[in-house]
């Protein structure tokens, strides 16, 4: 190999190594920018749709909301026990009729979450407090109902689940469907007054738990502790 050819090969090798180093450094920088929250980087927002904020007036103690495919929004009012309808950005004056009796006699009791079945947004689920009498004393429990939404009213209202345990704490309840169409229902109220969350560790009550239910309110067969 001649001296001139050897020199050309060395120059080519050096250029290749430098080029690879630049690419590697750039890749490392990209990775760092992608995963290191402490490094500032530019986020392109020019192709994001415009967002219009429309204030909705007239709601009282709104607790939760759910969206229909047609754009309607259902909103629960916790302390009034009303189910309200927002359509085309405006609150409909009349509330949805057919809602069962909601117990609102204690602080933080009332109508709570609202959710639609993933296969049919006319099938609606609500959680709320229900008044019961135990040994002559007025108590409250959390229940789950299912109903059919017919325009501006509920039909076929059915109580499909009642939580075990008297709610003497703050048993707020939320709903969410999983990808396999099981219904998750959270229940607060783990604290008994000034206690330390005893209900959360008590398998005999549902308070302080996250429940996994079928869409008819029955427990899923492969749930843990299903026989307790």
Residue ranges and their predicted role:
Residues 8-20:
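Bacterial N-terminal signal peptides
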Residues 140-151, 199-216:
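Beta-propeller blade signature
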Residues 193-201, 227-228:
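Short helix/strand-bridging catalytic loops that position acidic/His residues to coordinate divalent metals
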Residues 26-194:
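Acidic, Gly/Ser/Thr-rich repeat motifs that build Ca2+-stabilized beta-propeller blades
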Residues 185-192, 218-226:
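The feature captures the short pre-catalytic strand/loop hairpin that immediately precedes
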């Amino acid at each position: 190999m001649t001296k001139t050819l050897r020199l050309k090969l060395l120059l080519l090798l050096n250029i290749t190594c430098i080029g690879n180093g630049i690419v590697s450094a750039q890749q490392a920088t990209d990775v760092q920018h992608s995963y290191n929250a402490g490094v500032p980087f530019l986020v392109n927002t020019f192709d994001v749709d415009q967002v219009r904020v429309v204030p909705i007036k007239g709601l009282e103690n709104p607790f939760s909301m759910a969206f229909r495919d047609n754009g309607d929004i259902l909103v629960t009012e916790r302390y009034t026990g009303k189910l309200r309808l927002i359509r085309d950005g405006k609150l409909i004056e009349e509330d949805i009729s057919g809602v069962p009796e909601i117990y609102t006699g204690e602080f933080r009791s009332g109508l709570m979450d609202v959710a639609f079945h993933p296969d049919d947004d006319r099938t609606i689920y609500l959680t709320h407090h229900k008044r019961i009498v135990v040994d002559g004393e007025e108590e409250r429990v959390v229940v789950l109902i299912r109903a059919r939404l017919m325009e501006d009213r509920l039909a076929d209202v059915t109580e499909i689940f009642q939580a075990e345990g008297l709610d003497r704490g703050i048993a707020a309840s939320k709903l969410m469907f999983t990808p396999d169409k099981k219904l998750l229902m959270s229940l607060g109220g783990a604290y008994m007054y000034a206690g330390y969350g005893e209900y959360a560790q008590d398998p005999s009550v549902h308070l302080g738990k996250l429940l996994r239910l079928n869409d008819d309110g029955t427990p899923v067969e492969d749930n843990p502790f299903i026989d307790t």
